[in-house]
């Protein structure tokens, strides 16, 4: 049996402020730092170890992973970073308060932008200062790869490309893998692994800072999945209500 651990980064400063974050490189809040330390302690107490780790190129996911590995005394584990594990790009919504955006455009429209699989939010203009195509972390992107906006399908496409090329082969060679990433990135992976429909993924929430374990067979088909706490397995319905989605 193969085990894969997925974790959404700890609460970020913009999670706390209820802002659309996307590719904006926002750091963890104090609570997010605590969530990351707790996640590391949970994984260590439950006997987990890792051979390789994957994360995005955004500091909230990177820092979460660093803290987890530090808490587990696994700072030596190789870490691979890729923009393909970044959060969904929210286009012109990035930086905006979600409640204020709902008042401006209507709750139904904002819900469609956030939860539908194939509707993109308004795109950034190329002269928008939020369009960070010159950021050195993206210098290897081919022309046209840097998004102005994304729907969940766009995110899923790049995430699964990376999954099949990089992560799945590691799992198939019996490497113990942890992925520290983002809400929509992990939703994309869960949708793929569990064969969820577009409608099925709409209501899927991934809590910040709580390890999600997938037990997989030799073909990487899920046997079961569960969240972890200090006492071991915990089902989704028992996740603490205070967690910010």
Swiss-Prot record:
Molecular function terms from GO: phosphoglycerate mutase activity
Site (Transition state stabilizer): 182
Residues reported to bind substrate: 8-15, 21-22, 60, 87-90, 98, 114-115, 183-184
Gene that specifies this protein: gpmA
Pfam families documented for this protein: His_Phos_1
Record organism: Bacillus cytotoxicus (strain DSM 22905 / CIP 110041 / 391-98 / NVH 391-98)
The UniProt record lists the keyword Amino-acid biosynthesis: no
GO biological process: gluconeogenesis; glycolytic process
Function: Catalyzes the interconversion of 2-phosphoglycerate and 3-phosphoglycerate.
NAD is among the record's keywords: no
SMART domains linked: PGAM
Catalytic residues identified in the record: 9, 87
Stated family: Belongs to the phosphoglycerate mutase family. BPG-dependent PGAM subfamily.
Reactions catalysed, as given in the entry: (2R)-2-phosphoglycerate = (2R)-3-phosphoglycerate
EC number, as in UniProt: 5.4.2.11
Metabolic or biological pathway, per its Swiss-Prot or TrEMBL entry: Carbohydrate degradation; glycolysis; pyruvate from D-glyceraldehyde 3-phosphate: step 3/5
Protein name as annotated: 2,3-bisphosphoglycerate-dependent phosphoglycerate mutase
Sorted UniProt keywords: Gluconeogenesis, Glycolysis, Isomerase
